[in-house]
Amino acid sequence: MASESLHNLDSPKSSRIPNFFKMSISERISELHRRGLLTSDDVHQLVSRDHQLDSAVADKMIENVLGVFGLPLGVALNFLINNRDYVIPLVVEEPSIVAGLSGAARIARLGGGFYSDPVDTLLIGQVQSVVDGDASKKAQLLLAEKQEILSLANSLHPKMVARGGGANDIEVFHHKAEEDGREMVVMHLLVDTRDAMGANMVNTMCEGVAGLVEKITNGKVFLRILSNLTDRAIARARVRIPVANLEGKGFTGQSVRDGIVLANDLALADPY
């Protein structure tokens, strides 16, 4: 088993904290604060419970509020990502999730931890215009007015543009409706959402440019909505685990490795 001396267990900001699960809640908070993983303000929020959602605030967030619903807040330990320690906050109601994550992170840590690449943050908004005439020509008209479309979309979210994000490109496709053969021109609005989840922002932009799309295509816009296929917003991470570190509970490292390979083979062959 690889040594843990590369990442001192008692070093500042180390996420490897032995026997953390045996501590009381107040001891856990104090230990994370001592290691610099919680700020003094974090500690105050946790101890005072000021972090919990107030019913009056909840009533302004959604409709027909009756109260708030609490769930446990815990942290997964042992995460080493790009040579930096992290504790991962988790709000879950099911036992073993936090322990399982922490255990997997410890195994990964022994081999050097996880490595992640910069995350692509493009979401796609779709604006569907039903048109008469040559759909390919209508598509070209949209492409010719790309800058006007992007300027209008970005005017709706200037703060996102100030953070380096916003709508930065369009793509245009045309299809025939299967039922009656009607021509559809579908514009994809590509939006860099930076650190925001961005769904509402993309929907707002699609709504905002719909009238302009109708004017350009001389068509009728129906759907104007965020795409559920997020193939431009992809997080990539990798980890290498020495076979010896997989050994345990009566299984050799080789047998665990081979079982993981078989499970992956099934996942590739069967989408269920």
Task: Locate predicted features.
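Glycine-rich anion/phosphate-binding loop at the beta-strand->alpha-helix junction
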Residues: 196-197, 202-272
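Acidic/polar, glycine-rich intrinsically disordered N-terminal extensions of enzymes
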Residues: 1-86, 90, 94, 114-122
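Structural signal for hydrophobic packing residues in well-ordered secondary-structure cores
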Residues: 36, 105-112, 146-160, 206-221, ...
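Small-residue-rich
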Residues: 60-61, 68-182, 187-190
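Beta-strand elements of well-folded, non-transmembrane domains
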Residues: 191-195
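Generic detector of well-ordered alpha-helical segments enriched in charged/polar residues
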Residues: 18, 26-33, 44, 59, ...
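Anaerobic metallocofactor- and corrinoid-dependent redox/one-carbon enzyme cores
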Residues: 49-67, 72-76, 92, 98-99, ...
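Generic structural signal for well-ordered, non-membrane alpha-helical segments
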Residues: 54-58, 94-98, 138, 142, ...
